[in-house]
Swiss-Prot record:
GO terms for biological process: fatty acid biosynthetic process; terpenoid biosynthetic process; viridicatumtoxin biosynthetic process. Residues 935-1259 are annotated as: Malonyl-CoA:ACP transacylase (MAT) domain. NCBIfam families: PT_fungal_PKS (TIGR04532). Residues 1714-1743 have a biased composition (Low complexity). Residues 1747-1824 form the Carrier domain. Residues 396-829 form the Ketosynthase family 3 (KS3) domain. Multidomain protein; including a starter unit:ACP transacylase (SAT) that selects the starter unit; a ketosynthase (KS) that catalyzes repeated decarboxylative condensation to elongate the polyketide backbone; a malonyl-CoA:ACP transacylase (MAT) that selects and transfers the extender unit malonyl-CoA; a product template (PT) domain that controls the immediate cyclization regioselectivity of the reactive polyketide backbone; and an acyl-carrier protein (ACP) that serves as the tether of the growing and completed polyketide via its phosphopantetheinyl arm. Residues 1649-1690, 1702-1750 are annotated as: Disordered. This is Non-reducing polyketide synthase vrtA. The modification O-(pantetheine 4'-phosphoryl)serine is found at residue 1784. Pfam families: Acyl_transf_1, CurL-like_PKS_C, ketoacyl-synt, Ketoacyl-synt_C, PP-binding, SAT. Viridicatumtoxin and its derivative, viridicatumtoxin B, exhibit anti-methicillin-resistant Staphylococcus aureus (anti-MRSA) activity. Moreover, viridicatumtoxin and a C2 acetyl analog, spirohexaline, have been demonstrated to inhibit bacterial undecaprenyl diphosphate synthase, a potential new target for antibiotic development. It comes from Penicillium aethiopicum.
Length: 1824
């Protein structure tokens, strides 16, 4: 006992922690705590709140996915408290206790810090009391000797409390099905006016009367003198109060206890407490002694524990098993106060006043009336104002870079190729490619030409226009107008995320709302130059910089911040710094960061050159004496950054760790663009100080290093002075290595910083420093001379950079902006990881693994499969477990999927080879956009298996916990444990019917929860016999406790009342009618009695009855070849044997609460589907036990109701997949999955089923499957996604970037210069004038060229072939161009080829090219060709091009192909037919000699030609002709002059081939008076040897009418012979008959306006200029049919021999439009011939013969095709507008086009309301 003087100094003190919140606004209290925690005076409060949140985040992360995924993000207590208790997630008890602990201990700590008082509670005079959860707060204080210890102990007590709440809530949900969301039902009521004894007596009687099983009893949880609290499941409490008049009429109130039971000794045991304490992972030392005593709320005396672990155990035990006696608490407190007789006062700390606290005060005052009570309210301080806040230090977490991707110059299209470029010391510098801009016109080294570049050099990435638009849900038009920087930013962002294994939402740190993007961009070349040539719909979202990051966030659905940053040359590094800052500030948990730069605008070259930034001699010469400026470069880079602790928790591969970052500005520089050494040093020192790193620890600095005299000198000074000072000097082992990536790839400007960072990351990864190649002559003399003394310098060859043993490498990356900004990043090695393994033989103990590959397109899927196979071939030692983890858990899964289950790498390789060889990608069906329905099927007793193998139980703690929890319920209900049965015990008791049936139900309920953990949630349930009980639990009709009680009691009653094996059951493969027919016709069984117990399928019937009868039936059926299988069960359920069971079962069930199902129940008792809460009741269970199992009827009803379909996945949740076997028979196309299977490992079965679900579109939560052992797996760096790319590129045409400089002189440029006048690199002929794109890969080549028909040689060639006094291009011109391009590209790919033999195939020309008579105008054409060497095939398409804008038309006017073939095959073919051709020639000559055939002279021949075409002298190669009807032979002599640069001059080709045209337009067998004949093209043109100048040839042809065309079309083969040997053939040249009256219409010269502005002859006034695109080629747009009358069917080409008539690009018109299309008809058929030259203004109406899609609906679809640049074949009925890239902007464009062109008014929302093509077509058909 204390001395009286000590009592005066230290009066008795009580700290009381109740179980109620203060009456204040709790959210406001939390807000106040949060505000104060930001003040430096409340550091411990801040620490406690942060520690508490970390504990809760950690605990939430451990919850099952279906719960944690719905927990809103929280990063502080205010965020969490404002979301409430989350009762609908089953977290009410856990969250309520957490809030109370955080509030109480936060207020306690803050109360002390507010007055700067340390914790000083004398042990002898202080005691701590708590009520219920408040005991954990009391424990935290009792275990702490200081406030700092309260922080740690409080957080860990919070952990135990939260876990206890989760456990109690989870366990309680098994006692009674959860209430519907939003409804609260109390689990406790307080009763006043009755004694504890009378209440207990009444409860004992009521529990017995209601038949409440042990787990559902109503019991006393708390008591005092005036009240008693009773607890139990809400429905049981309600029933008890209704059953007992004493309770019903007592004064009672429900308590706010909504989340389960505590204080229940009959439910919980010490095992439950031990489970909570084991999984809580408390950090409080188990042996920590008490500081203060804690009074028990049950006994009123201090707990007897002596250590921390014992105290927490006793508190937890009291909470779950101990009854609260308030009187004992009060007596214990009064006893403590009275222990100090000399005391004049006592101090009591509490949180406001409650009823219980008032009782404590009254008791003290009564027993000690002379004692002064000093009340200290721990809440008051929080409302005080403490003046100006003193800010805490910001967070300094280390950050982890976990993913990267890039496109760099020099062909470095991924990070591996980038490293190869660096390691090999390659220089990526080149001249500006022609697809960027034309150097010949835009480069002037003298600087005299305004706006011209003064240097031709740069560093450029490959294929900047190539993009997978469909993957990113963009239409071709949107993709084309979108800046390539935007496109490649999102591509590299995806690739970096893929490398990082970042699956959005996989973990707490990867939630969508916690990911942001930060990119640097400093130019808008595409918007300012390329796209501005024809500003389209997507000019703003496709070109404005902010959309670069906006597009990333939008596509990935990230709602975190997105910032586009422009700090000139340091933009990307500033963006990385911004991302790091956001992570340090807690704004995001994951940051995508990077930079972009694509160069297309010569203006920036001019500007930088005029400012003397650029080197006139080439690459950046960093630290070279001749450094003369930087060399521009392109680059795209992305990285993924996370906090280090998150990356480690998420099992990420960490490339490097960011220690700190800083940015400042050279404010003291001599000019804004001049660097300043002092500020650079400041920035470097700042990052070192923030990280606590010595400069001597830094072993590498990646310099900004631009290769300028000033920049290199100043940066070298700043770097060396900071990191390699003269005092103290670096030790010999502390070499400082330096380097600069710009010496390899130039200055990427906005992408420079990210290029340097990725190089740095690669160095960490490769453990090497690549050589510096910047010094081309000698070291810059301005640099420090003492590098040796400083132990610093460059590396000139690849040098090992190894991680020191037990230490980390530290490096610095510098990036400076021309505007004066400096950004510095400090990095270190990733933490070392040590591989864990379950066993030496296996990573995770599993024998089979799921491997998944997916894509969004079939081409990409095939590519991804090939890439994976290639990876395995390069890495044969790949760990299959890691590969499975990577492809399943760490990949985003797309709609096209291939997956398999394998046990070895070799088996996987075999599967992949087979898939690739069979081209499986073409047959894979896309998974449905809507998740298919999933039905859980629960098998009955027939599937019982002795022991479910232990893999699931051992490997999945969540499954094990569920089984053990359910087993505890089983034992509490008085039944034996089922765990031995599940583990395969053969003990007699284990094999009893009670245990057998309970083990099945426990297994099935646990499996249902396990599947839910894996993300598979049922849409409906169906149970077979016993399995229906488990189905009812999953559907929420019955609680788990009630189900187990009913099943156990039913089994007990059956055992008691029925004779085992007196009856039996028999499964028969026959219908009931077949069985009855066989049984009744056999005398031995004609009178036996049996029942149909189960109708499983139409031909699978289970019979039941007396054992002897069933055995007799079996013998009869087997003799008639019916398959029979006796069921090994002791009782015959669903037969008369159950008659003695059902009455008692129904009585027991009457005391059970039944609820409406939360999901449909396919009732096998009723053969229907149950939705309501009335149908399933005690009577239902009675009938279910006795009646027939109507499995077939239940399934068929569900199908009729639309609940299931062919896409439904059926998951069997039993010991063996019996029920899904029935489903397979009822619906063979159904997908089925099993949970367990006899004679197969559980994990193998589960893995196969997961793959089945995955392929069906019910994507599992793969991460949960790997989660129990996640740390043993490694994320593999697999090949990146195989993109299905198309080139979307708008070339800059003309010289208007230069021309605008003339305006200030009053000179107005007249149009753009003709492409023909622009010299270009590469191929150049008389018809090919400028190369706009040339890409050469190993096996493919692409060439885009521009030509001008008005160029002299081209114009002359066209005018050599005039029709109707117009120069019309002959198809020989297109043939020559095809041959020229074909040989050019082929030799690029096969330079060693001696000869190139080409077959020009499938030439088709839709629109004749009529040359304008206006002098000085331009008529540009575009030709696009792509050669595939594997296919030996090249495709070609010709387009009209807008002379003003340079944009090509969206549709081609001509197309062809070139096949590269073996000429030996030609010779063999022609040798077989040569004698026949020579025979016909000889016959014609004889007929001419006999006067039967006509011999025609050269002059007469070309006079006949003039009926249609007038050839110039060049083309007149025919010397004479013999003609007989449609057959002719001609002697030909080619003129010697080539008249230009050609592959094969067109006038030579025409001379040897146009005999066919002479027959059709000059033969007396042809009606040339009314018609002329034009050719749509030919099938093939082959020449064995080049045509020779002046050489003599023979041409022979016979034309035949095509029967399908009814005389309107003729075709023939033109044979070309030299010296009576066939040397060439023009196969199947076709001619179509056209009424002569249409000659003027088709062949009128274009107007000056049309030719000079639109660049296409006769463009109609209503037609918009053609859209520029280099997207995938499209089929030509069909034109409006005109009434039948005079025009041949399908005519499209106008050329007496090789000339094509043109179609208009006008769309069909409505009756209310002024501009129409004139037409004529032919008696045979309708036609679509129109002319682009036609400007007729008469309206016509389309014919009624058009098919469904050529009316208004078809016109709408064509507009959609045209405006999106999508091929018509892509517009299938099921194609969604979202997939096609039709966004809100495109919707507006389409609705406007519909209105303007078709006269129909539709809202743009139509494409949202009708999301597919088919729905839009139907809507238009019905409403327009």
């Amino acid at each position: 006992m204390l001395h009286p003087t000590e009592v005066e100094k230290f009066p008795p003190t009580l700290l009381y922690f109740g179980n109620e919140f203060p009456n204040d606004d709790v959210n406001e209290l939390f807000r106040r705590l949060q505000q104060h925690s930001k003040d430096r005076r409340f550091r411990l409060l801040n620490a406690y709140l942060e520690e508490s949140i970390l504990v809760l985040q950690d605990e939430v992360a451990k919850l099952p996915h279906h719960i944690k995924s719905r927990v809103p993000y929280f990063d502080n207590i205010v965020t969490l408290s404002e979301h409430g208790y989350l009762r609908d997630l089953g977290l009410g008890a856990a969250m309520e206790s957490a809030f109370l602990l955080i509030l109480q201990l936060g207020l306690f700590i803050g109360n002390h810090e507010a007055v700067d008082r340390e914790l000083n509670l004398p042990k002898n005079v202080t005691t701590v009391a708590g009520l219920s959860v408040g005991l954990f707060s009391a424990a935290a204080i009792a275990l702490s000797a200081s406030l700092a210890e309260v922080v740690r102990n409080g957080a860990e007590c919070l952990r135990v409390s939260f876990r206890l709440g989760v456990y109690a809530g989870d366990f309680s949900s098994s006692l009674e099905a959860p209430q519907p969301e939003g409804m609260l039902a109390s689990w406790a009521h307080v009763v006043t006016g009755m004694t504890e004894e009378s209440v207990q007596s009444e409860l004992t009687r009521v529990n017995e009367d209601l038949g409440n099983p042990e787990t559902s009893k109503v019991f006393i949880s708390a008591a005092d003198k005036s009240s008693v609290s009773v607890s139990g499941p809400p429905s049981r409490i309600k029933a008890a109060f209704l059953q007992s008049s004493d309770l019903r009429y007592s004064k009672s109130l429900p308590l706010p206890v909504y989340d389960g039971l505590c204080h229940a000794t009959h439910i919980y045991s010490q095992d439950d407490v031990n489970t909570v304490l084991e999984i809580s992972e408390s950090l409080i030392p188990a042996t920590r002694p008490f500081q203060l005593s804690v009074i028990s709320s049950r006994t009123g005396v201090p707990f007897t524990a002596t250590t921390a672990s014992d105290l927490l155990s006793e508190i937890a035990t009291e909470l779950v098993m101990g009854t609260i006696y308030l009187d004992n608490i009060i007596e214990g407190i009064v006893r403590h106060i009275g222990a100090f007789p000399g005391a004049q006062s006592c101090r009591i700390d509490s949180f406001r006043t409650s009823i219980i606290f008032k009782g404590i005060l009254e008791a003290i005052a009564t027993d000690h009336p002379d004692l002064t009570i000093e009340k200290n309210d721990l809440v008051d301080w929080v409302h005080q104002d403490f003046g100006t806040r003193r800010r805490n230090d910001p967070a300094n977490s280390k950050l982890a870079i976990v993913g990267m991707a890039c496109r760099m110059p020099g062909g470095a299209n991924n990070v591996e190729e980038f490293w190869q470029l660096l390691e090999q010391g390659r220089d990526a510098c080149t001249t500006v490619p022609p697809d960027r801009f034309d150097l010949e016109t835009h480069y002037d080294p003298t600087g005299k030409t305004e706006n011209a570049a003064q240097t031709p050099y740069g560093n450029f990435i490959d294929r900047p226009g190539y993009f997978d638009a469909a993957f990113f849900a963009m239409s071709p038009k949107e993709a084309e107008q979108t800046d390539p920087m935007q496109r490649l930013a999102i591509v590299t962002a995806y690739e970096a995320m893929e490398m990082a294994g970042l699956v959005i939402g996989r973990t707490q740190s990867t939630r969508r709302d916690r990911i942001g993007s930060y990119y640097g961009q400093a130019s808008d070349d595409w918007r300012e130059l390329n796209a501005s040539q024809n500003i389209g719909t997507y000019a703003v979202p496709g070109g404005v910089r902010g959309f670069t990051v906006g597009r990333i966030n939008y596509f990935f659905k990230l709602s975190g911040p997105c910032l586009c940053i422009d700090t000139a040359c340091s933009s990307s590094m500033a963006a990385v710094h911004a991302a790091c800052t956001a992570l340090w500030a807690g704004d995001v948990d994951v940051a995508l960061a990077g930079g972009v730069n694509i160069i297309t605008d010569p203006d920036n070259y001019a500007g930088l050159g005029n400012a003397h930034f650029l080197s006139p001699t080439g690459q950046c010469k960093v630290w070279d004496k001749g450094a003369d400026g930087y060399c521009r470069a392109e680059g795209i880079g992305s990285v993924v950054i996370k906090r280090l602790e998150d990356a480690e928790a998420d099992n990420d591969n960490i490339l490097a760790v960011v220690l700190s970052a800083a940015t400042n500005h050279c404010a003291d520089a001599i000019s804004i663009t001049h660097p300043h050494a002092g500020h650079q040093k400041d920035n470097c020192r700042r990052v070192l100080r923030k990280a606590g790193v010595s400069p001597m620890q830094v072993s590498y600095v990646e310099m900004h290093g631009t290769g300028t005299q000033a920049g290199d000198a100043i940066e070298s000074e700043s770097v060396l002075d900071v990191f390699a000072p003269l005092k103290p000097l670096r030790r010999p082992d502390q070499r400082l290595h330096l380097g600069a990536v710009k010496s390899n790839i130039g200055h990427g400007e906005a992408a420079a910083g990210i290029s340097s960072l990725i190089k740095m990351l690669l160095m960490f990864q490769k453990n090497a420093i690549p050589p510096h190649i910047g010094i081309r002559t000698e070291m810059n003399p301005q640099l420090p001379k003492d590098l040796g003394r400083r132990n610093a310098g460059l590396v000139f060859e690849t040098t090992p950079w190894l991680r020191p043993e037990g230490k980390k490498r530290i490096s610095v990356v510098n990036s400076f902006g021309a505007h004066g900004g400096n950004t510095t990043l400090l990095l270190e090695d990733a933490p070392e990881r040590h591989r864990q393994r379950i066993s030496p033989e296996s990573t995770d103990g599993r024998s089979v693994y799921a491997i998944s590959v997916s894509a969004k397109s079939k081409k990409s899927l095939q590519g991804n499969l090939s890439s994976l196979l290639g990876y395995l071939e390069q890495h044969p030692d790949t760990d299959l477990a890691d590969l499975s983890y990577t492809t399943c858990a760490r990949r985003t899964h797309h709609n096209l999927r291939v997956a398999t289950v394998v046990s070895s790498v070799s088996a996987l390789q075999k599967f992949l080879r087979s898939a690739i060889d069979s081209n499986i990608a073409t047959t894979v069906q896309s998974v449905p956009s809507n998740i298919p329905s999933v039905v859980f099927t629960f098998t009955g007793q027939g599937a019982s298996d002795r022991g479910v193998r232990q893999e699931l139980f051992d490997d999945f703690p969540a499954f094990r916990t569920q089984v053990l929890q359910l087993d505890q319920l089983v034992q509490r209900l008085g039944f034996p444990s089922v765990v031995p049965a599940l583990r395969g015990s053969t003990d007699e008791e284990v094999l009893s019917p009670v245990v057998s049936q309970l083990s099945i139900v426990v297994l099935e309920i646990a499996l249902s929860r396990f599947w839910r953990l894996l993300g598979i949630r049922p849409s409906a349930v169906i149970g077979h016999s016993l399995g229906e009980y488990a189905a009812l639990e999953v559907a929420g009709v019955l609680s788990a406790a009630d189900v187990l009680y009913l099943v156990g009691r039913r089994a007990q009653i059956t055992e008691q009342r029925c004779t085992p094996y007196g009856h039996s059951m028999l499964s028969v493969l026959a219908t009931p009618d077949e069985i009855d027919r066989v049984v009744r016709r056999v005398p031995e069984t004609s009178n036996v009695e049996y029942e149909v117990s189960c109708q499983n399928t139409h031909e699978d019937t289970v019979l039941g009855g007396a054992k002897a009868d069933i055995e007799a039936i079996r013998k009869v059926l087997e003799t008639t070849s019916y398959k029979c299988v006796p069921l090994a069960i002791p009782f015959a359920y669903h037969t008369s044997q159950m008659d003695v069971v059902v009455d008692e079962l129904e009585e027991i069930a009457k005391n059970i609460p039944f609820k409406a199902p939360s999901i449909p129940v396919l009732s096998t008792m009723l053969g229907t589907v149950v939705f309501d809460g009335k149908t399933i009741n005690p009577t239902y269970l009675r009938r279910q036990t006795r009646g027939t199992v109507k499995f077939v009827a239940a399934v068929e009803t569900a199908r009729d109701l639309g609940l299931i379909d062919e896409k439904t996945v059926w998951v069997d949740l039993g010991p063996h997949p019996v029920c899904v076997g029935f489903i397979r028979k009822l619906s063979p196309e159904s997908r089925i999955a099993a949970s367990c299977r006899r004679n197969e490992e559980n994990l193998s079965t589960i893995t196969k089923s997961l793959v089945t679900l995955h392929l069906a579109g019910a994507t599992p939560l793969w991460n949960e499957f790997f989660r129990p052992n996640e740390q043993v797996y490694r994320l593999l760096n697999l090949p990146k996604y195989s993109w299905n790319e198309t080139n979307y590129w708008i070339p800059y045409l003309g010289t208007w970037a230069l021309d605008k400089a003339l305006l200030k002189y009053g000179i107005t440029p007249v149009g753009a210069k003709a492409p023909a006048t622009l010299p270009a690199a590469g191929l150049r002929t008389s018809t090919i004038h400028q190369t706009t794109l040339e890409t050469i890969d190993s096996m493919t080549a692409t060439l885009h060229v521009l030509s001008d028909m008005q160029a002299p040689e081209f114009r002359a060639a066209v005018y050599g072939h005039t029709m109707n006094n117009c120069g019309v291009a002959t198809s020989s011109i297109w043939t020559d161009m095809a041959l020229a391009v074909g040989e050019y590209l082929y030799r690029k790919l096969v330079p060693q080829a001696k000869e190139v033999h080409m077959n020009v195939c499938d030439l088709e020309v839709l629109h004749a090219q009529v040359i304008s008579k206006v002098k000085g105008c331009s008529q540009p054409l575009a030709l696009e060709a792509h050669l595939d060497l594997d296919m030996q095939y090249m495709s070609l398409k010709w387009y009209n091009t807008n002379a003003a804008t340079g944009e090509r038309a969206p549709e081609w006017f001509a197309s062809a192909a070139v096949r590269f073939e073996n000429p030996d095959a030609w010779t063999a073919e022609w040798n077989r037919t040569g004698h026949l051709v020579l025979g016909r020639i000889e016959t014609l000559r004889r007929l001419a000699a006999d006067g039967v055939a006509n011999r025609i002279s050269k002059r007469l021949a070309y006079t006949l030609f003039k009926n249609v075409v007038d050839y110039s002298d060049w083309y007149r190669g025919i010397d004479d002709v013999i003609m007989n009807d449609y057959e002719a032979v001609a002697n030909v002599t080619l003129i010697p002059d080539r008249h230009g640069t050609w592959h094969t001059p067109p006038h030579w080709i025409d001379s040897v081939c146009h005999l066919a045209g002479l027959i059709m337009n000059g033969s007396d067998a042809s009606n040339t008076q009314d018609f002329f004949y034009v050719t749509p093209g030919s099938d093939s043109f082959r020449l064995l040897k080049p045509l020779a100048p002046g050489a003599k040839y023979i041409s022979y042809v016979r034309m035949f009418p095509l029967s399908a065309e009814a005389g309107n079309m003729y075709a023939g083969d033109v044979y070309i012979l030299k010296d009576d040997v066939i040397v060439g053939v023009l196969c199947q040249i076709r001619f179509r008959r056209v009424p002569r009256l249409l000659m003027d219409r088709f062949f009128s010269p274009p107007t000056a306006d049309n030719a000079g502005v639109h660049g296409t002859p006769g463009s109609q006034r209503s037609q918009a200029p053609p859209a520029a695109t280099h997207a995938a080629t499209k089929s030509p747009q069909k034109t409006l049919q005109v009434p039948s009358g005079h025009v041949p069917n399908k005519a499209s080409i106008v050329d007496t021999n090789h000339v094509q008539a043109s179609h208009p690009s006008a769309v069909p018109v409505r009756h209310d439009q002024s501009n129409g299309v004139s037409g004529v008809s032919d008696s045979d058929s309708s036609t679509s011939i129109t002319s682009s030259n036609s400007t007729a203004d008469t309206s016509t109406t389309p014919t009624e013969s058009e098919d469904a899609d050529s009316g208004l609906v078809g016109q709408c679809i064509k507009i959609i095709s045209r405006e999106t640049n999508l091929d018509m074949s892509e517009l299938t009925p099921d194609a969604t507008f979202a997939q096609l890239g039709v966004d809100s902007l495109m919707s507006l464009v389409l609705s406007e086009k519909f209105r303007n062109e078709l006269g129909i008014d539709v809202k743009s929302s139509l494409f949202l309301e009708c999301p597919t093509i088919g729905e839009v077509k139907e809507w238009i058909d019905q409403n327009c």
